[in-house]
């Protein structure tokens, strides 16, 4: 294989799109490749490694998980939600942790305004608060979609539909962000790494807004371990994963699983593999053979998981595949899976309905879609992920990329799913990160 062909294949596998010869005159960014993908393409060419094509579609067969039992399994697992929250250290989050987190987020925003020469503390009452000088045009969406709301939530502005954000008489809390951060880490150690992740961008928010610093390099460079920890060990992530595992274990218990049948699972946007670990460990513990297809829009995330799962029990396998959930899946994957899993991925697509419809095409009758997403507005997420393009891709009428359970229910049902289930818990006991299960029958 010549080097040009190898480069083309590497770019196709990293971006999931067709690349013509004419495309080689284009910039990486025009081909859908961010800096991380560019690095991954170069590594592929250097190491001469390519992914195998997806396995041919399996013929239709009886699902190993009898229809109807998914609902029972989910309801049974829901009775243990408070146990999951306690085990994960996320119980009573809204009264115990959120007030300090809210204070920290507002402090980072105030600090950014100060460093951009637009001090809110010195701003007269009635002043219209707008984008500080030097903010990149593309980051104005962070202000429109989050920053002005954060200021309103903190009482520092009132938002008028015509005039915009107007400074109030509320005094700015001048407590330094690093002092608040130190207190949170001391008093809420389970959330320490989550708030350290917030600090990565929050403490340098002004520099990111003006383009002096690249948030992608900040988050995926030396802070990559904090991202991995967030997806795997952050209390709300752990609680949601425990809930998902409980559903799977319940389905495999009491003879509901048909012995001798392997389970076909596909994960959309597997990324760093935080959810994968819980699901695979549950299947291995239950001694259930499985085929697990680990997908992401870029293969740059695959290396660590390939190494982690290179030795699986007999009868089980893991495949790695570049998959863009925003386009129809390849024919080889249609109706090929009993379970599709996705954590913190689908929200970052242009159209929830299109993405959910494409997921539905992957499932066979009796299968289900396990979706883990933030369904409560968490402003700290905007200070971290709001600096990335994927946070603002939506073109389907959403006001923000995160939506509540009722919106997910509507989109999933319109996409061909039947029941959409979630833990109906409100108040201090509600988790900000929810497991939703959508059934196919």
Swiss-Prot record:
Biological process per Gene Ontology, one example term: methylation
EC number of the protein: 2.1.1.-
GO MF term (any one): methyltransferase activity
Pathways per UniProt: Secondary metabolite biosynthesis
Keywords: Methyltransferase, Transferase
Chain positions covered by the region annotation Methyltransferase (CMeT) domain: 266-368
InterPro entries: Methyltransf_12 (IPR013217), Polyketide_Synthase (IPR050444), SAM-dependent_MTases_sf (IPR029063)
Function: Polyketide methyltransferase; part of the gene cluster that mediates the biosynthesis of ustilaginoidins, dimeric gamma-naphthopyrones isolated from different fungal species. The first step in the biosynthesis of ustilaginoidins is the production of gamma-naphthopyrone precursor YWA1 by the non-reducing polyketide synthase ustP, via condensation of one acetyl-CoA starter unit with 6 malonyl-CoA units. YWA1 is then probably substrate of the ustZ to yield norrubrofusarin via a dehydration reaction.
Family per similarity comment: Belongs to the methyltransferase superfamily.
Entry protein name: Polyketide methyltransferase ustM
Organism whose genome encodes this protein: Ustilaginoidea virens
């Amino acid at each position: 294989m010549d080097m040009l062909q190898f480069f083309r294949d590497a770019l196709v596998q990293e971006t999931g799109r067709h690349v013509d010869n004419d495309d080689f005159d284009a910039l990486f960014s025009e081909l859908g490749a961010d800096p991380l993908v560019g690095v991954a393409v170069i590594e592929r060419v250097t190491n001469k490694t390519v992914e195998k094509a997806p396995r041919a579609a399996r013929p239709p067969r009886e699902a190993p998980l009898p229809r109807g039992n998914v609902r029972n399994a989910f309801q049974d697992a829901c009775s243990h939600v408070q146990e999951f929250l306690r085990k994960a250290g996320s119980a009573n989050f809204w009264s115990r942790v959120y007030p300090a987190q809210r204070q920290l987020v507002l402090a980072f925003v105030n600090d950014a305004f100060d460093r951009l020469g637009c001090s809110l503390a010195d701003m007269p009452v009635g002043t219209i608060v707008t984008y500080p000088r030097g903010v990149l045009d593309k980051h104005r969406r962070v202000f429109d979609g989050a920053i002005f709301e954060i200021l309103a939530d903190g009482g520092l502005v009132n938002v008028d539909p015509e005039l915009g954000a107007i400074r109030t008489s509320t005094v700015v809390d001048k407590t330094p962000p690093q002092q608040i951060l130190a207190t949170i880490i001391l008093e809420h150690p389970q959330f320490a790494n989550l708030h350290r992740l917030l600090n990565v961008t929050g403490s340098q928010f002004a520099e990111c807004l003006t383009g002096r610093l690249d948030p992608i390099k900040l988050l995926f460079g030396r802070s990559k371990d904090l991202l991995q920890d967030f997806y795997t060990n952050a209390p709300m992530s752990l609680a949601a994963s425990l809930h998902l595992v409980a559903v799977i274990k319940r389905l495999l218990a009491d003879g509901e699983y048909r012995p001798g049948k392997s389970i076909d699972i596909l994960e959309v946007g597997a990324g760093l593999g935080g959810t994968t670990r819980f699901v695979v460990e549950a299947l291995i513990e239950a001694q259930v053979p499985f085929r697990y297809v680990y997908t992401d829009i870029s293969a740059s995330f695959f290396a660590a998981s390939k190494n982690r799962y290179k030795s699986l029990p007999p009868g089980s396998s893991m495949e790695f595949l570049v998959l863009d959930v925003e386009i129809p899946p390849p024919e080889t994957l249609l109706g090929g899976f009993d379970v599709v899993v996705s954590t913190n991925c689908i929200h970052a697509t242009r159209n929830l309905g299109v993405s959910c419809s494409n997921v539905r095409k992957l499932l066979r009758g009796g299968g289900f879609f396990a979706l883990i997403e933030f369904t409560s507005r968490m402003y700290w997420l905007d200070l971290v992920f709001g600096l990335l393009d994927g946070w603002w891709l939506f073109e389907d009428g959403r006001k923000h990329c995160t939506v509540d359970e009722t919106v997910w229910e509507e989109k999933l049902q319109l996409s061909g799913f039947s029941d959409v289930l979630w833990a109906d818990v409100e108040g201090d006991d509600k988790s900000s990160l929810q497991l939703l299960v959508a059934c196919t029958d």
